[in-house]
């Protein structure tokens, strides 16, 4: 499918207008461990963790005047440094670019709102959206796993992590997105094989995931 034409106002605009509570489910997987021992973290923090896939399923809610019930949006992101390194005292990435997959069932207005929602919920992580593509998005959430497929990105996350006492394992990061009660997950599959980010990756079998429900209350804002 052909990417949608990017509108400068979509990518560069200030905070979008939104109204009504938005609730749903979220999952992310990174190319870096989020739960590890200090010995592992100190050796990898500067060199990995520059990419991630984030996915949202909206159960109900209105954003930027658009009802988004049942729609999904996925962002594959890549930066020039570990995306979360600021949390452990490092310098934040100077850029984080995103390829965004929007639900092919959405209208043009809903697609724009889904991109804005992803930018809003990821709290400024994304500095530039380089491609927007409507696709069929799978977001399967079961008692044990969450599986997402969208375009050239996919991830499968097992809920929970198993760990031993070696190297004093601990949680080093927090989710990129707004999440009510985030939980740790074990990434079974995580890849992006598309174009637009000058990077492709596959990073399975890591303690590199977060998941959980998200919700936030609407605020009236004026659109630019």
List where the protein language model places each region.
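Mature, soluble, non-transmembrane domains
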Residues: 96-97, 101-217
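N-terminal Sec/ER secretory leader and immediately downstream segment
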Residues: 20-99
């Amino acid at each position: 499918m052909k990417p949608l034409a990017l509108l400068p106002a979509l990518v560069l605009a200030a905070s979008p207008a939104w109204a009504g509570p938005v609730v749903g489910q979220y999952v992310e997987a990174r190319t870096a461990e989020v739960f590890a021992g200090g010995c592992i973290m100190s050796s990898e923090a500067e060199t990995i963790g520059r990419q991630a896939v984030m996915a949202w399923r909206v159960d109900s809610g209105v954003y930027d005047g658009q009802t988004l019930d049942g729609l999904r949006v996925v962002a594959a992101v890549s930066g020039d440094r570990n995306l979360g390194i600021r949390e452990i005292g490092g310098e934040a990435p100077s850029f984080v670019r995103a390829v965004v997959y929007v639900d092919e069932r959405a209208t043009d207005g809903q697609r724009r709102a889904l991109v804005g929602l992803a930018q809003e919920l990821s709290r400024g992580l994304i500095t530039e959206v380089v491609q927007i593509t409507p696709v069929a998005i799978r977001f399967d959430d079961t008692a044990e796993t969450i599986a997402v497929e969208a375009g050239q990105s996919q991830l499968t996350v097992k809920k929970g992590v198993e760990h031993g006492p070696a190297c004093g394992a601990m949680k080093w990061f927090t989710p990129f997105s707004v999440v009510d009660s985030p939980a740790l997950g074990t990434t079974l599959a995580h890849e992006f094989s598309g174009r637009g980010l000058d990077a492709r990756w596959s990073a399975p079998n890591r303690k590199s995931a977060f998941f959980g429900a998200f919700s936030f209350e609407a605020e009236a804002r004026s659109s630019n």
